[in-house]
Amino acid sequence: MSNYKFETLQLHVGQEQADPATDSRAVPIYQTTSYVFRNSQHAADRFGLADAGNIYGRLTNSTQDVFEKRIAALEGGVAALATASGAAAITYTIEALAQAGDDIVAQKTIYGGSYNLLEHTLTQFGVTTTFVNAHDLAEVENAIQPNTKAVYLETLGNPNSDIPDIDAIAAIAHKHGLPLVIDNTFGTPYLIRPIEHGADIVVHSATKFIGGHGTTLGGIIVDSGKFDWKASGKFGNIADPNPSYHGVSFADAAGPAAFVTYIRAILLRDTGATISPFNAFLLLQGTETLSLRIERHVENTKKVVEFLANHPQVEKVNHPSLPDHPDHALYEKYFPNGGASIFTFNIKGGRKEAFKFIDNLKIFSLLANVADVKSLVIHPASTTHSQLNDEELAEQQIYQNTIRLSIGTEHIDDIIADLEAGFAAVRGE
């Protein structure tokens, strides 16, 4: 279906015809743990990767398979692997690339959970991270050492929606024989497809825009199929015979889909962060309206940014659509149709004023999720990024007066009226 447009692909990929078992037009929920093999040789072929298909529910499921194929198509990849959460997708990606003694080069301004994973959790297993200012290309390249295994970015940083120069950083990574990993959770494939800009692996928290309704946890890893694992010489676990899977070379057995096949066959098999069939089904429902929702998110965001930028109680709006934002040129290059409906602003005052503003909103829900059809708000310094010390917070331009907004799809007049009510409460009105 590669000739179809995005809006058609999001509805049909993975189930081009009615379900063969039931004639169902909707993708069924295959609620099963295991699958019957036709005979012993069929079972052996499945386990040996000679025959593609279901083996066990921890590894594959037919509902999950449709979801994986659909997101892979939307991102322009060759294959995908769904996981139980976005955190699992990111963790598996790094674990597949780096082992004890290895290092990752990562953008400083990323989601707090990802920062904590790289800075603290993975160091317990001997994997370190060198955090860099992604806007300083010389700093990015100088951070690459012989033990570096990947470069890690976000298309839109969390929470400030800062934008790296993906094309330039991809060129640096590939010059050194390294894959570029990009978290496209905030960008979405409707607004930007990182593989077209040189990304080798794309990850998502599907909980966010893909699901879109705040109901379902899930993650997904998309393999571009473009990275040559053998030529790199740095990834023996993928390119060489793997003793934990009876000597299979995943590069040989799975070809362009080697990366996600390795994760499925080894990491998912051994640690089991499997997406449930029901969650895969719900995420498919979200995928089918992705383009429609994103258009409304973007439309509303433009108007909210304009409102905040001209408000006397706002110290600063951190949104790349503004001409004075340092990433404005990159925003116009990579997001010609708009984006960044999750962003921050600094209210005049400090923590007290930020809390007062947040606590007096009615439509905006105070919670730790983003990218919901409902508008959301949070104070990052005391919640999502509270594990960072003061220096780390300052490096990410998160202060006690910083407020993160996730703009939903409500009527724009109601959104702006709610924000104004928050400001009025701060004024004591």
Language-model features and meaning:
Residues 76, 147, 313-316, 363, ...:
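Glycine-centered tight turns that cap/initiate beta-strands
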Residues 271-274, 278-280, 285-289, 294-296, ...:
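Conserved small-domain helix->loop->beta segment predominantly found in fold-type I
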Residues 222, 344-346, 406-408:
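Short hydrophobic/aromatic beta-strand micro-patches
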Residues 156, 185-187, 322, 348, ...:
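Active-site beta-loop-alpha junctions enriched in small/polar residues
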Residues 119, 128, 146, 293, ...:
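PLP-dependent enzyme catalytic core of the Aspartate aminotransferase-like
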Residues 39-88, 113-120:
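Conserved N-terminal alpha-helix of the aminotransferase class I/II PLP-enzyme fold
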Residues 2, 14, 18, 80-310:
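Conserved PLP-enzyme active-site core in the AAT-like
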